[in-house]
Amino acid sequence: MKHIKKYENFGSGNYASYDNSTGENFWGDIAGGVLPICKKTKRILLNLRSKYVNEPLTYNLFGGKLDGDENIIDAVKREFLEECGYEKNIELIPAFIFKSPGGFQYHNFIGIIDDEFEPELDWESAGFKWLNFNELLSIKPKHPGLKLLLKDEKSLGIINQLIS
């Protein structure tokens, strides 16, 4: 089957793409997200997606698509700031890269932050949770992207190293 992407333009360079090979909708062509881990507490921050986004009311990373000429690192840091108000330094460790048959890419990063904080959420989020590793594995419902990340051996190795 030929891969066909359909685009819906939302203005200001924002568009959604549709991959007919999988039936999936993606926001842009390249996107990324971060799974933040607090260095001191070893707990992990998850985003509960709002009812206004794809895969609503599922737990996932904070993230989104590249804007303009951004690189993936700058995009992930910007999205983390926009979605939860985090203005301090975050170290990003590359993890799993999801690639759809139609060409969409989602770059997952594990983030290291010094302290837990109370996120100031935007409209894309309905809530958040700070979790230990076992709670992360058992929380439901998970976004399909989070499920894939947690099945990836490299990503799990990075997480385990940081929480040990």
PLM features per residue range, with description:
Residues 50-52, 78-79:
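Recognition helices and adjacent regulatory flanks at domain boundaries
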Residues 26, 51, 119-121:
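Short secondary-structure boundary/capping segments
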Residues 3-7:
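Short linear clamp-binding motif
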Residues 8-33:
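Acidic, metal-coordinating catalytic segment for phosphate/diphosphate chemistry
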